[in-house]
Amino acid sequence: MFKAPPLLGFRAFPYLGPMTIDNDYIAEKFSLLSKLMDIHGENSFKTKSYSVAAFTLEKLPSSIAELPSAKMTSIRGIGDAIGKKIAEILETGELRLLQQYISQTPPGVIQMLNIKGLGPKKIATIWKEMEIESIGELLYACQENRLLLYKGFGEKTQQNVGAAIEFFLQNQGSHLYAEIEPYASRIDTQLQQQFSTEQSSLTGDFRRQLEIIDHLQWVTTITPADATAFFTTAGFEEIQPDPSSASSATASAAGSSRFKSPEGIVLEFIHTHPDTFFSTLFQTSCSGEFLEAFNETTHWDPHHPHPSEEALFAAANLPFIPAYRREQRIVLDRATQHPLTPDIETTDIRAIIHSHSKYSDGSNTLAEMAAACIEKGYEYLVISDHSKSAGYANGLKEDRIREQHAEIDELNHRLAPFVIFKSIESDILNDGALDYSPDILSTFDLVIASVHSNLKMTEEKAMMRLLNAINNPYTTILGHLTGRLLLSRPGYPVDHKTIIDACVKNKVAIELNAHPRRLDMDWRWISYALDQGALISIDPDAHSVEGYNSIRHGVLAARKAGLTPDRNLSSFGREQFKTYLAERKKSKGI
């Protein structure tokens, strides 16, 4: 679920009752007002007057509230107009003018003021020219090299802004699985080394490989006292266990303990006895829905000792279900009828579909993208740079498409049997049309259709755009179905079943965009898609050769829904892929 980080650094909330309205409080109001006015392009003289007033108040040796009105307005940098604003704040705790600007500014834009290296002028460019309204979107834009296309943003600035955003997000309480995984692994390794005779295992949401992790959990036979000594010595803060958490409900009599790392990450330890270790591990590795269904189906005894989770499932007369599949009741229902099919692995991915080169907003040349594919053992590469409406991403106009296709032809001749397929990530326009005429679209081997603009729309509008694009015979793959950016931007509302059904009817594959900030389509809809006969395509949306590594995160998400290689387009071999494209075009008469 999308969860916007709170606004930090500014007290921009309504007045809620008695508080100390001191010089610093008033100065913060004026400082924020000055910056917001700057962002909105107001007269620089007016904006500067509020920043000067803020500076004056911060340095004032006495409380402004204790000064007579005449003396207050005589202070250099205050004056009559500012004096009236100070009186308003002293009386109400608020400033109406500031509230007006706050109401006219997206919360995420205000939040950007907390990012080191971003001032009002740059934020105005980000908001008004790049049409970015959250720091998560901005981080994604940094990763796609989009800032480089705008005045005042060089490569170094882009790197610094990206690093500052990552630091900020790390302290907001929720983390992408991809970002917290290395940290969790390091802590786990240290535990194994320090307590080599004890049993410990990561559990909870992390073990189920959910895309967003609020805190890390372990099941362990380490005693609470030993855990406390280990972590407090390392500079962690001991905090009270959360009695409402699911882990607390399933914890054994040995109890639980929680710590906060210097980075602000919460670690929870569920202490258990050796004979109930695997029972506790199992319980804490299930969603509430799955565990309830398991209890109803098996009537198992959680206090009975088991030497492994596999043994626990065997005792319940069930095939083993790995932790990442323990989400939905339907998984257990199907497992009671027949063994689960082997899930897709990263080794099953035979190609890179959906990648960007220097022709649009990628970091590498076509040759470099192809060479990296060959080095990693992939059989082919689908280059899908941005289309002409994507001015923010240096989208390709018709003449540059012809230039790119000529280079692809030359590379294919030189790199055979490796193949670069000609593609485009075509913007889905406001009316659902694709970005080029049929004559141009026919020059591509395949077309990925995606929404990139005007994301704030009703479900009716979103469905119209998507369905029109799906009905276009040239659309081969529907890209990032909802446009979401995890922890940054919710997706536009869609009727998933209708979209999936339309894709099946029109022989359009549905992308599982593997970028850790997207993972879109959501894995929770893949099971329905597979039941309807849909073809999924795990694609990295790579903007550099390093971006190929995102494939793994798409695979982790797909495994949660039981996707198999035969139902994933990027698992098709080179010749199978060629045949698929040819047969699809023939069926569409294009």
Language-model-derived ranges and their functions:
Residues 209-357, 365-377, 382-383, 388-418, ...:
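Charged catalytic cores and adjacent phosphate/nucleic-acid-binding surfaces used
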Residues 34, 46-216, 220-257, 264, ...:
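Accessory alpha-helical DNA-binding modules that contact the DNA backbone or grooves
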Residues 19-42:
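Charged, compositionally biased N-terminal leader segments and the immediate start
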Residues 423-426, 553:
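Active-site catalytic microenvironments in core metabolic enzymes, especially phosphate/sugar-handling
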Residues 14-15:
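Short, positively charged and aromatic/hydrophobic N-terminal segments
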